[in-house]
Design a protein with these regions (language model features):
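Contiguous, structured surface segment used for ligand recognition
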Residues: 19-160, 571-584, 589-602
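Generic beta-strand/beta-sheet core signal
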Residues: 49, 168, 196-199, 244-252, ...
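Substrate-binding groove of N-acetylhexosamine-processing glycoside hydrolases
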Residues: 24-26, 32-34, 40-42, 82, ...
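Bacterial N-terminal signal peptides
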Residues: 4-14
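Central antiparallel beta-sheet cores of small beta-barrel/beta-sandwich binding domains
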Residues: 435-524
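Flexible loop/turn segments at secondary-structure boundaries
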Residues: 54-56, 173-175, 201-205, 250-256, ...
């Protein structure tokens, strides 16, 4: 008998993932699994009803290509009308000509696979295409077997209507073929918005026939012709993906300054900006010619981009040039404008009216939000849930990007927890204040992070910078007498783990895999505890979804896929699937399959780019056998280490004077995946052992022995000059393995006191904050050591 798995309940989703052998991502809203399998031969009969001719031809070609890649042999699709089909697709709202996807379009579908074939029903062609994506993920095959599909019934629709990816084509230019490949992946992940970042300080990447100097003077010849833009938009629409352009204003405008300096608040000759960061050039918002420029630019761009939303950026405005400009000073007096924020709002109000003239809705980052603007603007939040909630409470729509910045290496489990509408924990603010601490976390670049910790009864809350207080988890109950403890929370920086040591008024914080020092100070006048209030049901409806972002300071076309895939599927699932899906272990199991599927079937290049990148570092003077062995060695090392998380690599580059457009991004670390499966498994084993599973110690030892065996040829790396850094890392991994043997001896009670005294410091000494490559295995082994040391002391 088939059994039903309905993902509306609180308890069932975890069991659903565990029980279901379906490697789907995102997971559907409802699944009913049967007990049989449908097999199809090398000719698949297909009937398609409701697709326009262009979309039908496009999708048939894709399905045939993907089926062949799955099967590993030729598969012929034969379109049938009157006879029985193996695969039937029916759309209720039939398409007569190519439909352009828009916000709020129906994306639901139902899918049934049984002995009679595959039946896909959808309200729109866009929902039908999501159903096709599910069919492809369900299919299995090889050259010696027929295509197979498990008997399954699915009823599916997205949780959020805005599910996007921002691609930054400015800081490093991305060719059209690269953009199209990401669209292929987005369609497979059921994402529906490409947010195309086309202008910034470092360049103007889209052809303007009205203002030709923009690309002539400020693109280095790297820009998209209008014909190419139309090609991308059509390709995206055939995949059910909207294309929302971003034209940054009034800041991030150095490229405009190079081409048209008279439009700037400070009129002078400008050179191309090559560095990364926030810069001062701003449009002169008191100059009428600026609004003529914007109006004419909008008229040209809306003729290219059919979507109803247009993004103006609006972030990181440094007002110095405005406040120094006499025309703007006079305007401030005339309109009673007090500061840079008032000036930006004055500009935004005028620009919003221009955008509305072209039947478009203005969109921008947090900084555009102001109650004087019409309610139909859309705010994209990089500042976090507190900012997004403020927007929604004021009656404005918003989407979340904080926590989805995939240009920053972060763990997929962190992205998976990052819900645009998180459930609010119960916090009792009437509990007595037990303790308050202030702490400071210095960063490698920029101002330090200032924080406060407060203990209210049994609750522990942390406040970071100007954000609201947030409930955190601790490793033990905290009292006034507690001198050492650990606290964990998620933040805009990533997952945080604090180690507080009140005995020495210092500690450390892990931001992802990067360990920063912190100092503790007493606090006589702590900030009032202020937590985020719950949103009303009406406010909930204003949170439209979210967007992942791939800013390209540290990314080129040669490693873009390594950074995006496969983890974008995790964010896609968070935006599509039920909120109750929170089992990260089950997610990682499916992600392994999806990584292979997206490489082998969809054609994403995360595996290819890594292999090519590693190959490029191997000396050409080596013989073929040595080159093969070196590549294998690099592949093994890549499974053990990670790039430093958060913005740590960016800040290291800044310290090295390599934080600019000319700096090469072709080292080993540039081709590393963002997280190590083997280290995650090691961490799980340590967690099991600490929880009482003594058998896990044997598996930990086997894992370490496996690493040691794989690194026995580490000396090969010395023969390739580009791998000097990797050789040093490999030697440190071997040191870790040696120290880990002492940790295991400590856990077995066989380590002498003389050997254990400095083991904690020795483990930590293997890693420096200024290392771009992180030997992440240090930290679970340190956790194991501290646990065993504590047990032995007692």
């Amino acid at each position: 008998m088939p059994f039903s798995i309905i993902l509306f309940s609180i308890l069932l989703p975890i069991f659903a993932v565990a029980a279901a052998p379906l490697p789907l991502m995102p997971m559907p809203k409802q699944i009913e699994m049967g007990t049989g399998t449908l097999t199809l031969n090398s000719e698949v009969k297909i009937a398609v009803h409701g697709f326009g001719s262009q979309r039908k031809a496009f999708q048939l070609a894709r399905v045939a290509q993907y089926f062949e890649r799955i099967a590993g042999k030729p598969i012929a699709l034969r379109v049938v009308e009157g006879e029985k089909a193996d695969l039937t697709i029916r759309v209720k709202q039939a398409e007569t000509q190519l439909s352009m996807p828009q916000l709020g379009m129906p994306e639901d579908y139902t899918l049934n696979i049984d002995k009679n074939g595959i039946t896909l029903l959808a309200t729109s062609v866009f929902g039908a295409q999501h159903g096709i994506s599910s069919i492809l993920q369900l299919a299995t095959g090889d050259p010696l077997k027929p295509l197979s599909f498990p008997y399954t019934s699915i009823s599916d629709a997205p949780r959020f209507t805005w599910r996007g990816l921002l691609i930054d084509s400015v800081r490093h230019f991305m060719p059209i073929a690269t953009i199209k490949r990401q669209l292929d992946g987005m369609a497979a992940a059921k994402l529906n918005v490409l947010h195309w970042h086309l202008t910034d300080d470092q360049g103007w990447r889209i052809e303007s026939k009205v203002f030709p100097k923009l690309t002539k003077m400020a693109s280095d010849g790297l820009y998209y012709r209008q014909s190419e833009v139309k090609e991308v938009i059509e390709y995206a629409s055939l995949l059910g993906i909207r294309v929302v352009p971003e034209f940054g204003m009034p800041g991030h405008a150095s490229a405009i300054a190079v081409a048209y300096p008279k439009l700037m608040a400070k009129v002078k000759s400008y050179e191309m900006e090559r560095h990364w960061g926030v810069f001062k050039p701003l449009l002169n918002i008191a100059n009428p010619e600026v609004y003529v420029f914007i109006d004419n630019l909008l008229a040209e761009m809306v003729s290219l981009f059919p979507d109803s939303y247009l993004h103006i950026g609006g972030d990181e405005v440094e007002p110095a040039h405005w406040l120094e400009n006499s025309e703007i000073q006079a305007m401030m007096l005339q309109h009673q404008l007090k500061n840079g924020h008032d000036l930006q709002n004055y500009f935004n109000i005028r620009v919003q009216k221009l955008i509305a003239k072209y039947q478009r809705t203005m969109m921008g980052w947090d900084e555009i939000f102001h109650p004087a603007l019409p309610k139909d603007i859309l705010v994209q939040s990089w500042r976090g849930h507190d900012s997004l909630n403020t927007v929604a409470k004021a009656g404005y729509a918003g989407i979340l990007s904080t926590g989805f910045y995939i240009d920053q290496p972060q763990y997929s489990s962190f992205h998976y927890r990052n819900d645009p509408l998180p459930e609010k924990p119960q916090i009792n603010l009437t509990q007595p204040r037990v303790m308050s601490l202030a702490f400071t976390v210095p960063r490698l670049k920029g101002s330090a992070i200032e924080g406060e910790l407060v203990v209210l009864g049994e609750q522990v809350l942390i406040k970071l910078n100007s954000n609201l207080h947030q409930l955190v988890k601790t490793d033990k109950p905290i009292t006034r007498e507690t001198l050492q403890f650990i606290a964990t929370m998620d933040s805009w920086m990533g997952p945080l783990q604090f180690e507080f040591n009140r005995t020495i008024n210092s500690g450390a914080i892990m931001i992802g895999n990067s360990r920063y020092p912190l100092t503790i100070a007493s606090i006589s006048n702590p900030a009032p505890v202020n937590v985020s209030a719950s949103l009303s049901r009406d406010n909930h409806a204003l949170i439209l979804g979210g967007e992942a972002t791939i800013w390209s300071e540290m990314v080129t076309e040669h490693n873009l896929d390594v950074r995006i895939w496969p983890r974008l599927f995790v964010i896609a699932e968070r935006l599509w699937s039920a909120q109750s899906f929170t089992d990260s272990d089950a997610m990682y199991l499916r992600l392994e399959h999806i990584s292979d599927f997206s490489h082998r079937v969809i054609g994403l290049k995360h595996k290819v780019q890594q292999r090519l990148g590693f190959n490029s570092l191997i000396s050409t003077t080596l013989g073929e056998s040595e080159r093969i062995k070196t590549l294998e060695l690099l592949t093994h090392i890549a499974q053990i280490v990670e790039p430093s998380h958060y913005y740590t690599r960016h800040h290291i580059k800044f310290l090295q004077d390599e934080y600019h457009q000319i700096a090469p991004l072709n080292r080993f670390v540039d081709y590393l995946g963002v997280e190590s499966r083997q280290v995650r498994e090691l961490d799980q084993l340590v967690t099991r052992y600490v929880a009482g599973d003594v058998a896990a110690l044997v598996q930990i030892e086997k894992q370490l022995q496996h690493w040691q065996m794989k690194l026995q040829d580490a000396s090969l790396l010395r023969h390739s000059p580009e791998l000097t850094e990797v050789h040093a890392t490999a030697l440190k991994v071997l040191q870790l393995i040696e120290l880990s043997q002492h940790v295991l001896e400590e856990c077995k009670g066989a380590l002498q006191p003389s050997q254990t005294s400095n083991l904690n410091q020795q483990l930590l000494a293997l890693q420096s904050l200024t290392d771009e490559i992180v030997i992440t295995g240090i930290y679970p082994m340190r956790t194991l050591y501290l646990h065993c040391q504590s047990v032995n002391k007692h």
